[in-house]
Amino acid sequence: MTNSNRIKLTWISFLSYALTGALVIVTGMVMGNIADYFNLPVSSMSNTFTFLNAGILISIFLNAWLMEIVPLKTQLRFGFLLMVLAVAGLMFSHSLALFSAAMFILGVVSGITMSIGTFLVTQMYEGRQRGSRLLFTDSFFSMAGMIFPMIAAFLLARSIEWYWVYACIGLVYVAIFILTFGCEFPALGKHAPKTDAPVAKEKWGIGVLFLSIAALCYILGQLGFISWVPEYAKGLGMSLNDAGTLVSNFWMSYMVGMWAFSFILRFFDLQRILTVLAGLAAILMYVFNTGTPAHMAWSILALGFFSSAIYTTIITLGSQQTKVPSPKLVNFVLTCGTIGTMLTFVVTGPIVEHSGPQAALLTANGLYAVVFVMCFLLGFVSRHRQHNTLTSH
């Protein structure tokens, strides 16, 4: 593989995470405006975003097999066509059914692109370098989470319609589409070069189960938390702008944390540092949820920084449970994380309706505690140490 080709593939991976980050994180900012647009209460509107999350889940799950049938480049180019259709649907339809369909399509495109991005990184890099590369790739999720709420706040404050936020997000996919030209992708399945050596199938082990539960609880907890922070902050008397700043600060700190940990992780055992970070994140979220508005800015910055490496380290440890990284195993852990995404409003919507936004934040806190327990238990069964030893010889 040429260096310029590797750079293009790496940038496609970066932007695939940015696309998903933008679509998922901007929800909390535009939900109120979309609810007004369709004359619905916010708690009911939140349920329609389940279509976005369902699209992400289904596409990541199916793409574990689709990658071996449909070439990656073809998938990305077809995704561009779907993206244009979905954004056009949001702009020109006033029907809730069409809105839900467009959200589902956006989810499908996002899920396919993100699973391709993750696979490309695990395919191109090995060992601890894979972990730091995945972490840097995931930082683009946070970067989008920092930039797009600011764009959304800027547009909405000027009474520009909410769907222009999604048009801006569509520009990320335009960049991915352009990068596919003159770029060679790894061939999989029937398109892969034939080898005589039989491929040995490895058992995944119970560590994958612990990591999958951790991935689900972490994403459900994180998105359940960050989706309702704006409503919670407004309930404490903050303006929409200040609430948006809290969300942007979280993702800015998350992004800086990822850059820092992509260097720091090289010097630590991944399972041990993951357990420490999961415990710290649970404590810091509790401090935010029970603190005063004066301390919220600082506690959300600390939470963003120390929780930044958790999800990517879960995926990296998952890929290291077998000697040869398996696209199906990586996609399985990703799928569990995406189930967490899909359940975000299914779980938190009724909680907010009955008990208010703070109850949703405390539920998220409980989920972070489960992540800590899973990471601790992983220490007794993880295979990453023996596989790292084998690859280093």
Swiss-Prot record:
Coiled-coil residues: none
Domain of life according to the entry: Bacteria
UniProt-listed InterPro entries: MFS, MFS_dom, MFS_trans_sf, MFS_TsgA, MFS_TsgA-like
Residues that span the membrane, as ranges: 11-31, 51-71, 78-98, 101-121, 134-154, 162-182, 206-226, 245-265, 273-293, 297-317, 332-352, 361-381
GO cellular component, as recorded: plasma membrane
Membrane-topology annotation of the record: Multi-pass membrane protein
This protein's UniProt keywords: Cell inner membrane, Cell membrane, Membrane, Transmembrane, Transmembrane helix
Localization per record: Cell inner membrane
Main location: membrane
GO MF term set: transmembrane transporter activity
HAMAP family documented for this protein: MFS_TsgA
Family, similarity comment: Belongs to the major facilitator superfamily. TsgA family.
PANTHER family assigned: L-FUCOSE-PROTON SYMPORTER (PTHR43702), PROTEIN TSGA (PTHR43702:SF3)
UniProt protein name: Protein TsgA
Native source species: Escherichia coli (strain SMS-3-5 / SECEC)
This protein's encoding gene: tsgA
